[in-house]
């Protein structure tokens, strides 16, 4: 159970804004970190099973870390009904296993800059799904305009050498977009579960279950993960920490705040992903199309939540 003070703390606007910004900064930093991890663990671009193993260990460790944290807070992590455990299993397999399988594969076939912006489509998928799921969250003029602006930005980033040369790599950009859609649907499902299961416990179980499935699936299909340096371990450790902290915080924020208040902070993700990819991976962000695309994506998210 949560303490009496946890809900009002996360419900305070300044705390909620700070935590939401931190979550999105962490998620944005995952783009260059994942690509660096591939290099440090010497995972080839076409070695999909090893990428799945890499993802699995990240989330398995993150889930275990969160459950240990919940135990330290004396939260009951095993007092789950069969129905609740089934819900957490479904959440873990969708939000972690399936979603990140597409995400990791997709990121290997696109740039960190493209990946961070393509993944921003998740905000617009959330708006569209909410229209069909919640009676009090229908599409409006602002939301429709926001979706159009956001997808315009996503399309722009894939234009190369002029409008006639449109480039969209299905197993790269397409998989990142598909991962964003799956995450949006799973997040709405997780919001419902968090009303009966503590957000930290829920996130720990779903990351652990999803991560274990990724590890098993990766090894079963011929994947491996060999440690070649302490730097590689440090990168995996960073990805583990950002997953546990960001997902747990985000779940706690969504439980006690309106989605429309927290969602606008998603604009930090493509911005952070683009800037950090340029800094750590040496990718080019000096093309004017990237600046315009980021403005369109951020404007779209702002209009959706206006």
Identify the function of each model-found stretch:
Residues 1-53, 165-192, 212, 216, ...:
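Glycine-/small-residue-enriched transmembrane alpha-helix faces in small-molecule transporters
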Residues 15-24, 70-71, 75-102, 171-179, ...:
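Loop-to-transmembrane-helix transition segments
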Residues 28, 60-64, 151, 211-212, ...:
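Small-residue-rich packing faces within the transmembrane alpha-helices of Major Facilitator Superfamily
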Residues 28, 32, 60, 92-97, ...:
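Hydrophobic/small/kink-forming positions within alpha-helical transmembrane segments
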Residues 37, 54, 106, 132-139, ...:
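Hydrophobic/aromatic residues within transmembrane alpha-helices
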Residues 40-97, 125-129, 182-186, 203-221:
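Transmembrane alpha-helices of multi-pass small-molecule transport proteins
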Residues 57, 96, 100, 114-121, ...:
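Helix-helix packing/entry segments at the starts of transmembrane helices
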Residues 66, 128-129, 141-160, 267, ...:
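Hydrophobic transmembrane alpha-helices of multi-pass small-molecule transport proteins
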């Amino acid at each position: 159970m949560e303490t009496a003070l946890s809900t009002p703390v996360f419900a305070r606007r300044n705390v909620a804004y700070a935590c939401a910004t931190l979550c999105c900064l962490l998620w944005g930093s995952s783009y260059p970190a994942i690509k660096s991890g591939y290099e440090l663990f010497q995972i080839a671009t076409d070695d999909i099973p090893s990428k799945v193993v890499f993802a699995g260990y990240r989330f398995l460790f993150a889930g275990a870390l969160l459950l240990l944290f919940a135990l330290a807070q004396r939260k009951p992590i095993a007092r789950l009904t069969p129905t609740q455990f089934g819900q957490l299993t479904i959440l873990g397999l969708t939000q972690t296993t399936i979603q990140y399988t597409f995400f990791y594969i997709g990121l290997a076939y696109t740039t960190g800059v493209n990946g961070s912006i393509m993944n921003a489509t998740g905000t617009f998928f959330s708006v569209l799904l909410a229209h069909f799921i919640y009676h009090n969250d229908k599409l409006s003029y602002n939301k429709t305009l926001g979706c159009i602006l956001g997808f315009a930005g996503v399309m722009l980033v894939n234009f190369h050498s002029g409008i006639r040369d449109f480039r969209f790599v299905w197993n790269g950009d397409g998989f990142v977009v598909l991962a964003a859609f799956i995450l949006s649907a799973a997040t709405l499902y997780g919001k419902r579960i968090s009303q009966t299961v503590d957000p930290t416990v829920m996130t720990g179980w779903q990351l652990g279950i999803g991560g274990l499935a990724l590890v098993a699936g990766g090894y079963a299909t011929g994947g491996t993960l060999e440690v070649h340096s302490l730097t590689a371990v440090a990168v995996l450790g960073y990805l583990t920490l950002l997953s546990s902290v960001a997902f747990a915080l985000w779940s706690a924020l969504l439980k006690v705040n309106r989605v429309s208040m927290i969602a606008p902070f998603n604009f930090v993700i493509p911005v952070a992903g683009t800037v950090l990819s340029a800094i750590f991976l040496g990718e080019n962000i000096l093309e004017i199309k990237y600046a315009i695309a980021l403005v369109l994506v951020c404007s779209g998210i702002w209009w959706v939540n206006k």
